[in-house]
UniProtKB/Swiss-Prot annotation:
Belongs to the MG032/MG096/MG288 family. It holds the Pfam family DUF240. It comes from Mycoplasma genitalium (strain ATCC 33530 / DSM 19775 / NCTC 10195 / G37) (Mycoplasmoides genitalium). It comes from the Bacteria. This is Uncharacterized protein MG096.
Length: 650
């Protein structure tokens, strides 16, 4: 019977080795793809001692394709964190490709495993303490079975292409041995030593040919606890090396770049240094026998494993807390509550009549408080929603709390549809859109006139639809005949000087009928904007047209300031019956647009009376856009609002 107990203890202790390895590899050490592949040791080196021996080898006295300075760096620079810092600083502003990597760059990259492993070890200890703290709320009845296993649960959350994957399955441990792991909990883990070496060895096929590789050694000390106050101390080393290479080109060819991911192939092996328990049993030899000396081959994603470990680890930590720690904590809180409620039930049974009254009073109070909380919650939500219409910044912030980034067009359209669908907030939404239109025009041509990318993001390749203030003469509305006369018989130039938008109506209204705005609704909305544009300009009649112009009383030249005002409002009554009227639109499309028909009156004014007389003769001093070349514009109102949100500072 005693012998059977010892066998069980040995198996359990060996499982602790495997689980400890998983503990330190969940994040910083990139997990191997699908358990890796077992490789015959003879395929890597004729003598396994080349891999299992000393991590530092002298390179003096041999011909080598690498410079003396590089070799000295590889042998002397053992401040691995500083090495990795040098790597990140070198490549912080450029994408990494395999042909960019020098031998020192690769050494510095592999040095990053030290920091990522250390960070993972710290995280495992931290999460284990959090699990124990959560369990302390109301301890489980069997901590070695029901307590969440930090290594196991974390491992489920990590991508398969991160190195190394040292779980029982990855180490080819049988399922019955792996099951024993559930009887032990991690207490602590420590990274005792990290070493990185640049090794050389004779080629096993070509005489006098030298091969090189990089080798990493990571030594860990772990402590596990089990039932009956069993404490297991495990000291083990994880060794990994690259494919053998003869020169830098060979080494570079082992790296593969796909998207932002940089991968390479590693061969690795775990070895047990010491395995003991608190009863004085030394099981090191048995553990080494079970582990064996088989190499495993894995394609490693270096981006997730090392280069961006500091981005990956917080995400996995957060996932662990959300999926494992928080549910477990709630479970213990619920168990504690259930226990306490059971105790209360027993007490209440003895004092049934009195406690029934108290229970009812407590229930009524609880419901009243819950109703009060719900009312308060509804009030806060209502106030937050109403505040979102106060400013562009408030609008962005509110919808961000609802999981929508309104600087993205699709999310913005969803938010606007939601707001407009609520009758009580329809006019406030419309008012904010009109303010966005006005502000969008000003920002487009003034404060943010150089933000080409944001303009393209909001308005597309063609830019703003109206007004085209920077288009010179082409930004003016007139008949095609008049435009031809001006451009063919004279030189005409207008340069934008300034643009301002005045909002002259405070009580903006959207006159909704049934389910929306009707196709030929004459007064669909109430608002008024004065878009005031100042130009510096000039024109000169061509010399061959000079005499006819004089005879006809047409000014032959002009220079000075031109003031153009677009009066924009919702009075479409004069144009709804035109044959080419586009329709009264306040309508969303499946292209993430909010089509909006504008009523526009164009007013041009210059200080030159002679030239002003010419403009009046063509009705350009007060032109109602109605039909043909002067048809009223239909704009994407959401684009203007989108541009404002993109340019609004947080």
């Amino acid at each position: 019977m005693k012998t059977q107990k010892n066998i069980f203890k040995v198996k359990a202790l060996l499982l602790s080795l495997f689980s400890a390895a998983v503990t330190i590899t969940i994040f910083a050490l990139p997990i191997f793809a699908n358990n890796g592949s077992k490789t015959d040791l003879g395929l890597l080196s004729k003598n396994s001692a080349d891999f299992l021996g000393s991590s530092k080898r002298s390179l003096a006295g041999f011909d080598t394709p690498f410079s003396p300075d590089n070799l000295q760096y590889l042998e002397k620079e053992t401040d691995y964190d500083q090495n990795f810092k040098s790597f990140t600083e070198k490549f912080k502003d450029e994408k990494i490709t395999n042909n960019q990597l020098g031998i020192v760059d690769i050494y510095n990259l592999f040095s990053g495993f030290h920091k990522s492993v250390k960070s993972t070890v710290d995280l495992m200890n931290q999460l284990q303490k959090q699990v124990e703290a959560a369990n302390a709320i109301f301890p489980v009845d069997d901590a070695f079975v029901k307590l969440p296993k930090v290594p196991t649960e974390l491992f489920k959350l990590v991508d398969d292409n991160v190195f190394p994957k040292l779980n029982p399955k990855g180490l080819n441990i049988s399922d019955n041995i792996a099951a024993l792991f559930e009887r032990y909990n991690l207490k602590s883990i420590e990274l005792k030593n990290f070493d990185l070496a640049f090794l050389r060895k004779a080629d096993v096929i070509i005489k006098d040919k030298v091969r090189y590789n990089f080798e990493m050694q990571m030594q860990f000390q772990t402590v596990y606890v089990g039932g009956g106050n069993t404490v297991i101390n495990l000291d083990f080393t994880l060794k990994a090396q690259t494919v053998n290479f003869a020169n830098l080109q060979d080494l570079q060819n082992t790296f593969v770049k796909v998207g932002n991911d940089l991968s390479t192939q590693l061969f690795w092996i775990p070895t047990v240094n010491k395995l003991t328990d608190n009863a004085g049993n030394d099981l090191t030899h048995i553990a080494k026998t079970v582990i064996g000396e088989s190499f495993f081959q894995t394609n490693v994603n270096l981006a997730k494993s090392v280069i961006e470990y500091d981005k990956v680890q917080p995400l996995v930590k957060q996932a662990f807390e959300e999926r494992v720690l928080t549910p477990f904590k709630k479970e213990r809180e619920a168990a504690k509550k259930a226990y306490e409620e059971e105790q209360r039930r027993l007490e209440e049974e003895r004092k049934r009549q009195l406690e029934e009254l108290r229970r009812r009073e407590a229930e009524e109070k609880r419901k009243a408080e819950e109703a009060k909380r719900n009312q308060e919650k509804a009030r806060r939500e209502r106030e937050a929603y109403e505040k979102s219409f106060n400013s562009f910044k408030d609008f962005k912030f509110y919808w961000l709390t609802k999981g929508k980034d309104v600087t993205k067009k699709a999310d913005l359209i969803d938010a606007l549809k939601t707001a407009i669908a609520t009758p009580a907030y329809r006019n406030r939404t419309f008012s904010l859109l009109i303010k966005g239109f006005a502000s969008g025009v000003e920002r487009y041509f003034n404060a943010n006139k150089n933000d080409k990318e944001l303009k393209k993001l909001a308005f597309g390749e063609k830019g703003i639809q109206f007004p085209r203030a920077d288009a010179g003469v082409n930004g003016l509305y007139m008949s095609n005949f008049l435009r031809h006369e001006l451009t063919s018989k004279a030189k005409f130039s207008l340069n934008l000087k300034d643009i301002k938008v005045e909002n002259t109506v405070e009580d903006t209204q959207l006159y909704w009928k049934d389910n929306g705005i009707h196709l030929k609704q004459a007064n669909p909305y109430k608002f008024n904007l004065n878009i005031k544009i100042k130009y510096n300009g000039w024109y000169n009649v061509h010399w061959w047209n000079w005499l006819p112009a004089k005879i006809l009383g047409i000014p032959t030249d002009w220079s000075g300031e031109m003031n153009l005002t677009f009066v924009v409002n919702g009075d479409l009554s004069e144009i709804v019956d035109k044959h080419d009227y586009p329709g009264t639109f306040f309508q969303f499309t499946d292209k993430n647009e909010l089509l909006f028909t504008l009523a526009v009156r164009e007013q041009i004014k210059v200080d030159n009376n002679h030239f002003m007389g010419l403009l009046k003769s063509q009705n350009l001093h007060n032109l109602q856009l109605a039909s043909g070349a002067t048809k009223p514009p239909v704009v994407d109102l959401a684009s203007y609002f989108h541009f404002v949100l993109l340019t609004e500072k947080s």
